[in-house]
């Protein structure tokens, strides 16, 4: 029996909340909190007849730590699930520390204003020291490790699919399939079609910033950075087919390089259609992906935030998206002195997700792991104090929960490898 405060009410949060309500014996009470309380009220009203979980709602501006502290003190939760924006990770972590409550999220911290001088100085130092230039990285949240450990609290970082399940797949491979892992390729394929000329499947601002940034991968103990979308490969995905995929920087590479140090190379690939890439490059060329505020008719606006307002809401894509996703990890390494390959992945159907929770599969594949991560913390399966990513915990109960609640794994011991 647990009380959980869930901050966020977008597409991913909606899925996570639906799934929490399917496990009322653990999620006895939940409070849905967002800047827009009306969205929380609407979702609570929809779910109330379907669950015995007691649902309340609240308004909170998660950019303001004092508001989050006040809400936590008023509600007294056992866990705070941060399913808002990565910009708000640190304020919510600060609030959890102030109130003595465990914390979890689905994506690592990045700043909303990348021109802030104080942040910029630290960022530029990290670029030189680490060797990659992505705006998002774990260093900001890892810096909280001692504080959470001394407070006897756990902060679980990145319990979505990628990051999240992909790291659990790596921990599973290390525990059950390999003595040593040599290479890891993380493949994220969305074979869905929503019918729009251009739309993003999750928060447009976060998505477009991620894919327009330089790519990078880990090789032989250091980062290799490349121009955005400059490495392209083809792969034949189970239940989806042949797709073009591009090497991106992705946050789990950073933690996997730390926690599976014998890995000689770790890469992340994501599929994109040509129409998406053409639109993205055009928008970038005209400055619409910029995060720098501009003055327009006497009002300050951020171009990428204005673009977000024009694009379809990812939460609205569910009824019109058809097809499947396929996300997983391909490994090479050794077991009992012999060379070995292994592929573990999940295939998820957009329309089946919509039938169950009114969502497309991108939100579903992030929201279900968020609930399963919370389940691990609330049931005592994962108890290590401090700040940790998913691969640092026992993967078995987490993957079993994913199998049970909608994201079953598939395996191959003779997969096609990604061409070097």
PLM ranges: what are they?
Residues 175-420:
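C-terminal catalytic/substrate-binding lobe primarily of soluble NAD(P)-dependent oxidoreductases
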Residues 86-89, 93-202:
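Glycine-/Pro-rich loop/turn segments that contact NAD(P) or position catalytic residues
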Residues 13-14:
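N-terminal Rossmann-fold NAD(P) dinucleotide-binding loop
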Residues 9-10:
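Glycine-rich Rossmann-fold phosphate-binding loop(s) that bind the pyrophosphate
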Residues 50-64:
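Rossmann-fold cofactor-recognition segment
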Residues 36-39:
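Helix N-cap at the beta1-alpha1 junction of Rossmann-like dinucleotide-binding domains, i.e.
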Residues 61-77, 88:
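Conserved Rossmann-fold cofactor-binding substructure of NAD(P)-dependent oxidoreductases
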Residues 72, 78-81, 103-105:
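N-terminal Rossmann-like NAD(P) cofactor-binding module of classical short-chain dehydrogenase/reductase
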């Amino acid at each position: 029996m647990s009380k959980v405060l869930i901050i966020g009410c977008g597409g991913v949060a909606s899925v996570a909340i639906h799934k929490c309500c399917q496990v009322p014996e653990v999620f006895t009470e939940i409070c849905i909190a967002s800047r827009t309380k009306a969205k929380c009220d609407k979702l609570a009203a929809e779910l109330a007849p379907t669950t015995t979980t007691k649902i309340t709602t609240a308004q909170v501006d998660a950019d303001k730590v004092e508001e989050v502290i006040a809400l936590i003190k008023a509600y007294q939760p056992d866990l705070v699930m941060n399913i808002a924006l990565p910009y708000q990770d640190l304020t919510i972590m600060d609030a959890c520390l102030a109130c003595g409550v465990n914390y979890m999220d689905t994506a690592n911290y990045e700043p909303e204003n990348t021109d802030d001088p104080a942040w910029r100085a630290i960022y530029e130092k990290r670029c030189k020291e680490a060797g990659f230039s992505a705006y998002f990285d774990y260093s900001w949240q890892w810096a909280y490790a001692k504080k959470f450990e001394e407070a006897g609290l756990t902060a679980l970082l990145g319990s979505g699919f990628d990051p999240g399940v992909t790291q659990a797949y790596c921990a599973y491979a290390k525990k059950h399939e390999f003595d040593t892992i040599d290479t890891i390729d993380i493949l994220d394929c969305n074979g869905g079609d929503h019918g729009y000329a251009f739309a993003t499947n999750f928060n447009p601002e976060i998505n477009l910033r991620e894919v327009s940034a330089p790519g990078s991968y880990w090789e032989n103990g250091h980062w290799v950075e490349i121009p955005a979308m400059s490495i392209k490969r083809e792969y034949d995905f189970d239940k989806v087919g042949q797709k073009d995929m591009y090497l991106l920087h992705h946050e789990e590479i950073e933690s996997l390089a730390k926690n599976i140090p014998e890995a000689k190379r770790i890469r992340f690939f994501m599929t994109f259609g040509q129409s998406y890439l053409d639109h993205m490059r055009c928008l970038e060329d005209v400055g619409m992906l910029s995060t720098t505020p501009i003055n327009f008719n006497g009002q300050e606006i951020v171009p990428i935030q204005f673009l977000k307002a024009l694009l379809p809401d990812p939460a609205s894509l569910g009824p019109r998206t058809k097809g499947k996703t396929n996300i997983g990890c391909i490994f090479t390494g050794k077991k009992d002195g012999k060379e070995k390959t292994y592929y573990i992945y999940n295939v998820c159907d957009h329309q089946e997700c919509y039938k169950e929770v009114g969502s497309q599969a991108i939100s579903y594949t992030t929201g279900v792991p968020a609930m399963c991560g919370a389940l691990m913390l609330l049931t005592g399966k994962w108890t290590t104090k401090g700040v940790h990513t998913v691969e640092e915990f026992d993967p078995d109960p987490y993957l079993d929960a994913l199998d049970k609640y909608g994201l079953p794994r598939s395996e191959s011991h003779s997969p096609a490898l990604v061409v070097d």
